[in-house]
């Protein structure tokens, strides 16, 4: 009997070992392909904004680096006390929400003044800030009521909504149930449910928004909407890569891509989906295996893309139970044509 049990145990052990060899941990495969950088921006990525040639990122702290440059991020010194829960920008001014002991305070910082210090936005009890031109501050009045105020880029009256904002871009604020202008009015023709993300579009008054099945583009100059089916499973975030005329839509396994017809075409009827590793993709053919074995396997939220002087850079907030790998990852073309920790 003991011999039979031993033989059975040995057989099971061999199956487990062989299975492990055939299915190595995803990020173990990464470390076989590239040497991982020491992580600077760890954990949950709460946002990245651009002011001039400088990028600012938050993971509770605020970090900065020159746009397009590889290497470590530097921690911004002299920030207010508390956890930075989000960033927004209007012109040279950086806005941030800080939480301490369940109390939230909004501050702003003039990046154009070398001796600038953080200044509180007084008379405001807001939980979050959003925006890339107009800055929207959000206060929670009850479990079903929120007040939204424009604190930079205009001065319309505050307005109430039953939905917490998804995000903001240009002069628009996105709610789960529709796109609003800076006065709180719903944009005519807006999709009205399940909206997941917003980013700036290719022209000065255009934005992209996304839901579970479609990518939409709103052109404010012509007041027109167009859309295309995107095919991304459980969209999380979107960004526009101007250099390649691509909308990147992050999901639960990497990101999908939509190619515009031209640098200024907002009509998604002329757009098409592209496959990672194809000629139009932001993932070069030579990088497809490393992409598939790394960020292409995991939930990305958020995602950001920026043009550089010679190409482009993509940042992905990787969300994984293994905290060793969660945090901000970057891809630089040229400079670092591989996905690696920031």
Identify what each model region corresponds to.
Residues 13-46, 52:
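Bacterial Sec-dependent N-terminal signal peptides
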Residues 34, 272-296:
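Surface-exposed loop and turn segments in beta-propeller and other repeat-based domains
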Residues 39-77:
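Post-signal-peptide N-terminal segment of Sec-exported extracytoplasmic proteins
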Residues 42-50, 81-92, 121-138, 160-176, ...:
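Repeated scaffold domains used in trafficking and secretory/extracellular systems
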Residues 54-57, 93-96, 134-136, 145-150, ...:
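Entry beta-strands of beta-propeller and related beta-repeat scaffolds
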Residues 63-66, 102-108, 142-151, 177-178, ...:
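Structural motif
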Residues 66-70, 109-114, 153-156, 183, ...:
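Short loop/turn segments that connect beta-strands within beta-propeller blades
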Residues 300-342:
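Blade-level signature of beta-propeller repeat domains, shared across WD40, Kelch, NHL, RCC1
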């Amino acid at each position: 009997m003991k011999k039979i049990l031993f033989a059975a145990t040995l057989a099971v052990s061999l199956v487990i070992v062989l299975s492990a060899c055939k299915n190595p941990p995803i990020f173990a495969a990464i470390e076989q392909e590239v040497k991982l950088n020491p992580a600077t921006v760890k954990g949950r990525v709460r946002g990245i904004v651009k002011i001039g040639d400088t990028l600012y990122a938050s993971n509770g702290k605020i970090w900065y680096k020159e746009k397009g440059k590889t290497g470590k991020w530097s921690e911004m010194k002299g920030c207010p006390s508390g956890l930075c829960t989000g960033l927004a920008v209007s012109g040279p001014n950086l806005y941030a929400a800080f939480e301490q002991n369940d109390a939230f305070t909004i501050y702003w910082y003039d990046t154009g003044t070398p001796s600038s210090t953080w200044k509180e936005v007084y008379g405001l009890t807001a939980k979050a800030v959003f925006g890339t031109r107009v800055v929207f501050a959000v206060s929670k009045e009850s479990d079903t009521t929120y007040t939204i105020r424009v604190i930079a880029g205009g001065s319309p009256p505050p307005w109430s909504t039953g939905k917490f904002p998804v995000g903001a871009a240009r002069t628009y604020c996105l709610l789960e149930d529709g796109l609003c202008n800076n006065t709180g009015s719903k944009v005519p023709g807006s999709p009205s449910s399940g909206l997941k993300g917003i980013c700036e579009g290719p022209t000065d008054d255009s934005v992209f928004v996304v839901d579970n099945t479609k990518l939409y583009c709103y052109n404010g100059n012509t007041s027109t909407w167009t859309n295309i089916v995107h095919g991304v499973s459980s969209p999380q975030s979107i960004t526009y890569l101007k250099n390649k005329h691509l909308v990147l839509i992050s999901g639960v396994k990497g990101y999908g891509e939509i190619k515009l017809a031209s640098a200024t075409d907002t009509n998604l009827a002329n757009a098409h989906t592209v496959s990672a590793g194809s000629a139009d993709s932001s993932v070069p053919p030579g990088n497809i295996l490393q992409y598939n074995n790394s960020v292409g396997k995991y939930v990305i939220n958020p995602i950001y893309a920026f043009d550089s002087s010679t190409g482009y850079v993509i940042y992905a907030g990787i969300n994984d139970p293994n905290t060793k790998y969660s945090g901000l990852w970057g891809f630089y073309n040229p400079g670092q044509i591989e996905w690696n920790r920031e």
